[in-house]
Amino acid sequence: GYSSAASDVYKRQIDMYGSVEAWEKSYVDDGSSSWARSAYYQMLADGYSDAEARKGTNWYDEIVQTGKIQDHQISLVGGGEKATYSVSLGYTNREGTIQNSYFKRYSLRTNTTYNPNKYFTMGQNTNLAAMETGGESGRQGDANTFAKTYTMNSWVPIYNVGGDYTGSVAPNAGRDISAVHQVAMNENDWTRMFHGQTAVFAELSNPWIEGLKLRSQFSARLNGMWSLEMTERQNMANKEASANNTLTETGNWRLNWQWTNTATYTKKIHEDHNITVVLGTEAIKQGVGRYMQGTRIDYIFESDPNTWTLDNGSSSNIGNSSRYQRKVTMFGLFGRADYSYKGKYLATFTIRRDASSKFGSKNRWGNFPSASLGWRMSDEKFMEPTRKWLDDFKLRAGYGTTCLLYTSPSQRD
């Protein structure tokens, strides 16, 4: 394993200082509302020195950090004449360059094969990973935390005299939510994910006919995501406070699987002719799963994540939704024939016959043939002078049909 650090790479910063004089002239205390008063004059009134009141805020420095990176792996590899195995455990912990942002991952990988005799082979490979992210989630545009460091003017302090986060204390002062405020709001939000995929196979080689190989493989992928986000009550300068907080909890899972069976026959005739024929079937199903989301408001202890459950919110305003994932199924038959003469003259012919739930009901099945011819010119005698610098040169021409599956099953008709 190893540990390192990732510092921010944004070395060129916009210098937003030196504007406090214009700010002083633009704002005076009208006495109508304490939260609308100029922070500069408020600080003077509260006993701060003129230098302290003029200091301003470097929003960029207030939200960045040097992120530590840890990456550790343990592997075990072994085997014998009839079996092999490998197992790997991994742990990753990466802090972001924005405070309170991070990425964690726990992973497991296994790979095993078993050969009880010269005809039969079976095996599996599995990858599992549990991940968690927190803090800044990569928002776009002005909503991004980095963007807020240069859309809020530097003469705006982090807090007003009442201890609340400042925002747009003036029409041209910047965003209503500062970068520091957003970092604080993201502190306890998280998203957790699970990714798992596995493939198992069995293979027979030369069971009855020399050159025949039978193979069956089943693979599956399971993905899950859970997230928890609290939108706190907000008290900001020059902006009406929000009356309620909101907890949003989201979860979904999705399963895809694929089953492929092939029979492959290879034959060499008189050392010059090589033939390979593949016949197979394939079944695919995607989108087995479900999505759910629930929201509630009015949490008494919004800063304590131990109380963040939907049951602890107000029952007077409940939001929820759920849906099944879109399912897509496909079944196909396919064949392929490859021929080569002395490795120089090549021909390939393929045919697929597929049925899909994305096809219209009147055209459930489709046929998709293709053919290609190739010539490996580098093996010709007239190419011998070029072999010192050009060892493989091949021309290939082909024609075929393919299918574009629509992005949504609802578009099939």
Q: What function would you assign to each model-found segment?
A:
Residues 1-6, 10, 406-413:
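Single conserved hydrophobic/aromatic residue that forms the stacking wall/gate
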Residues 4-99, 137-140, 183-190, 203:
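Residues embedded in well-ordered regular secondary structure
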Residues 4-7, 82-95, 99-160, 187-226, ...:
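Transmembrane beta-barrel strand/turn architecture of Gram-negative outer membrane proteins
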Residues 17-54, 143-182, 233-246, 289-320, ...:
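Surface-exposed loop/turn segments flanking beta-strands in extracellular/periplasmic regions
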Residues 45-77, 81, 232, 241-344, ...:
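Outer-membrane beta-barrel transmembrane domain signature of Gram-negative proteins
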Residues 55-60, 92-95, 178-187, 240-248, ...:
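Extracytoplasmic loops and strand-loop junctions of Gram-negative outer membrane beta-barrel proteins
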Residues 346-355:
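Catalytic-site beta-strand/loop segments enriched in glycine and acidic/polar residues
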Residues 357-359:
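Extracytoplasmic/secreted cell-surface and envelope-processing proteins
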